[in-house]
């Protein structure tokens, strides 16, 4: 058995072990189709060695340092201008610092839509609430840069589902909520987007956040909208459409 969280050099190759002493990296690259544990979180990789999911219980760890090199290198050739190296699980929540917990993420998503949820989770953990956190990362084709990230977290039994779109000028998330909000709310949102387009602005729907009660009933939906031309970001919260 190998020691946990160690580097081993064997025949000019460097191997790294996770919290259980299992090898999960070769020459600093994640191995394909494995499950590894770092800082109490379990992660999986797909057949190309890309992070595909995570789950665990966040802890409040404000003293954790970042790995700036891993953040700068995330995504390799598929990284785009304006990307951050975004932690899937924030360092302050016990997420590890290296590329085993980092993907290229639009800066507006990482510092806005995603950060808002991290702050909510951190506050709940600080207050001693029971928090579970999991997520899925989606990719287009062979790209190493995610197209979307879905995060599901429960705070004292109340579920929230965040979806972020990592693609500029995308409206893919519209189909995830257009059936859930009142018709006039949807029409007003579409009119607002049309007005921005008529003004010559590019627009993205960057995120949706669905909030549920303890019985699993959908209560509200928050939509993140970005004017890509002037950089203005707005968040709009809608109540669930009434039955009938």
What is the meaning of each model-derived region?
Residues 26-243:
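Domain-level detector of nuclease and nuclease-like folds
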Residues 1-28, 33:
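Long, low-complexity, intrinsically disordered regions
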């Amino acid at each position: 058995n190998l020691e946990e969280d160690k580097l081993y050099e064997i025949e000019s190759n460097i191997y790294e072990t996770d919290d259980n002493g299992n090898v999960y990296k070769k020459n600093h690259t994640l191995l394909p189709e494995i499950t590894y544990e770092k800082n109490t979180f379990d992660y999986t990789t797909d057949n190309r060695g890309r992070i595909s999911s995570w789950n665990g219980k966040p802890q409040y760890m404000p003293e954790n340092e970042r790995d700036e090199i891993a953040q700068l290198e995330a995504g390799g050739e598929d990284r785009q201008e304006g990307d951050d190296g975004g932690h899937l699980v924030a360092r302050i929540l016990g997420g590890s610092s290296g590329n085993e917990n980092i993907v290229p993420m639009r800066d507006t998503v990482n510092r806005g839509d995603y950060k808002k949820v991290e702050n909510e989770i951190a506050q709940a953990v600080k207050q001693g609430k029971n928090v579970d956190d999991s997520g899925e990362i989606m990719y287009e084709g062979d790209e190493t840069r995610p197209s979307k990230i879905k995060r599901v977290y429960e705070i004292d039994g109340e579920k929230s589902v965040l979806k972020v779109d990592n693609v500029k000028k995308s409206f893919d998330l519209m189909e995830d909520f257009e059936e859930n909000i009142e018709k006039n709310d949807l029409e007003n949102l579409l009119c607002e987007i049309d007005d921005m387009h008529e003004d010559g602005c590019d627009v993205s729907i960057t995120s949706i956040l669905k909030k549920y009660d303890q019985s699993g009933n959908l209560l509200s939906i928050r939509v993140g909208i970005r004017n890509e031309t002037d950089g203005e970001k707005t968040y709009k919260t809608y109540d669930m459409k009434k039955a009938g």
